[in-house]
């Protein structure tokens, strides 16, 4: 395997700039106050990508000369499973019309079809190689990390975000002990930051000059610490894996830079982590955490909370689906935050098993198809993280993780003749 397998891939600066915005405004759904839901940043990016695909790349995708067989096969399967789930949910919604109340599943399945099944296909044509996508994800995540850190330590930044942008979170910008970002917050933001750590890890191993990416990894991981434990813990596990891969496949320069910078940087990081999870009142801005400890919010245990949430038993309704991912139908109630249980209540047990089995099988096949060993291992770790994280919250129906995973898999083996000029 080529030690610096990313050095020979080109990433022109002009193209990289709009690719960064393309990635940032899809992964993080930015919505200023007064802007309707149909015009959030994620949906605007989808409209642009869809229009460009139809007008420029549809003929190429359908032509006999298009020889990226894995991409074509996987994208069609993604669209197929998206259509099946959406059509089934449409039928269930019609059958249960007026019989229950809660948060409907129909919109989630429609957006999965559009923002995962179709958008992953559209996005393939916006990047010439895997390095362009990795760099776009890296810089987009660094930008978000800077915003998170500024939000945590600067009240002025927090007020600015509070006055100008909507956020999907349990608490507003001014009432949270955690750092918030632009267009995302809490555990979803933590997972999205982790999504940026995976491309950063690949860049650290695959580029001969990796010092900048090591600093970037530390900054993103620190932001994840301020946001939520899920992304931070996954980032630490990914760090351990990355260090192992560097010492197996990396050069002496890569090993030295990671050892020196990493030791100093992560010593500081873990020192801050120890303070962050402690009750030390004297440490500057961390006093904001204690306000939540006084009312017991900070000490809640995630596992205990999930156990206390109502889950409907298996019956005919939950076998076929109720059309609500959280709510009450014919006396059955589910209020769970777990992605698997929300799908079970909304789509039904049968379709949920089929959906996750088919999707995870497709993800596993795409990981095995990757030729580069380092990328294969790190995207395999991302796959396992997605499976694990879905047990906490419905991250798959927030679309960022499937977008990053599938697009990285597609671009890893993109044929040279399919490059876009």
What are these model-derived regions, one by one?
Residues 34-43, 102-108, 184-190, 213-249, ...:
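Helix-loop-helix junctions and helix-breaking kinks within/between transmembrane helices
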Residues 134-159, 182-228, 232-246:
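Alpha-helical transmembrane segments of multi-pass inner-membrane proteins
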Residues 31, 38, 161, 283-347:
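Long extracytoplasmic/lumenal interhelical loops at the membrane interface
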Residues 1-64, 88-92, 386-388, 401-403:
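N-terminal signal-anchor transmembrane segment
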Residues 76, 237, 241-249, 256, ...:
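Hydrophobic transmembrane alpha-helices and their immediate junctions
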Residues 244-294, 314-316:
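A membrane-periplasm/extracellular boundary helix in multi-pass inner-membrane enzymes
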Residues 198, 202, 240-241, 377-387, ...:
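Transmembrane alpha-helices of multi-pass inner-membrane enzymes
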Residues 77-90, 98-123, 132, 136, ...:
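Aromatic-anchored transmembrane helix interface
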